[in-house]
Amino acid sequence: MRLSDFRYTLPKTAVAEYPSEPRDSCKLMVLDRRKKTTDHKQFSDLLDYFKKGDVLVLNDTKVFPARLYGNKEKTSAKIEVFLLRELNKQAGLWDVLVEPARKVRVGNKIYFPNDLVAEVVDNTTSRGRTIRFLNPDIDIFSIVEKVGQMPIPPYIKRDPEEEDKERYQTVFARIPGAVVAPLAGLHFTNPLLKAIQDKGVEIISLTLHPGLSTFREVEVEDISKHKMDSEYYNVPYSCAKVINSIKEKKSGRVFAVGTTVCRALEANATVEGRIKFGEGWTDKYIYPPYDFKVVDALITNFHQPESTLLMLVSAFAEHDFLMKNYKLALKSDYKFLGYGDAMLIF
């Protein structure tokens, strides 16, 4: 398929600047792939679509305040450092983006609040650097929780607010490492999760830390030529065991909460539709046509034009059916992107 197949006009007024309150009060568009039907619900109505024996898979990654501001040694020039991913915990090595990049060279030291100090050890791209934190035996995540800024998405045209630290985080976030929230998970509340569990649905978790490549533009017209950045994942043995059991017994369906869960599961799926457990890095890229091995239902948001997220959802829902419903969503005043409304596809 071509990049132009995923092009549509997204008005600024359709992009949610703030989340729904409460979380599960947002709209929910429900697509039945087999019947080609569309229903309009509220997210809390998601409960009605589960049956006893189904499995709900969450991504328990936690967004950390990845944007730091420091001063360069000697000149005291203000430098923005955006933490992308931890490369080596023992060595204190991180991939980062810096701004202004022209002022940051290999060998420079940057001083942050709370006596945090880093040295630039490599240039990776025009704005990319590898830095080493020089403070021995410190927990970087605990420090950035105090001094960092929450990295809300670039399409939200306002400054981060204190509320974002709580709302740009799922209620089940546990493992720090993401610079982008697993967006579909933002709509769940603890009471809704309990109600789903009480219905006989098993709720399990895996981890995938999404990075800024989520927002990276696809620059090739032939979408098969696009390359994804690698992201860390961990599929626990307990998670794989539950999924493999229901697949073998054909006793329920696998509901993936978001494209991150979908990618982690499909990256670890065998041709027989079983899941391998373990951790590693994945650059799994899903676009039409794609034969899903594990995921039976997908909960997701409304995504940006020409994005890899839209391509994945298009592969799951069937391209023409999905794009028709994106047009309908815009006409029906659905809100799009990170703080916007949701979609269930089964």
Swiss-Prot record:
Its EC number is 2.4.99.17. One of its GO terms (biological process) is queuosine biosynthetic process. It is found in: Cytoplasm. GO terms for molecular function: S-adenosylmethionine:tRNA ribosyltransferase-isomerase activity. SUPFAM superfamilies: QueA-like. It comes from the Bacteria. Transfers and isomerizes the ribose moiety from AdoMet to the 7-aminomethyl group of 7-deazaguanine (preQ1-tRNA) to give epoxyqueuosine (oQ-tRNA). Belongs to the QueA family. Monomer. This is S-adenosylmethionine:tRNA ribosyltransferase-isomerase. The gene is queA.
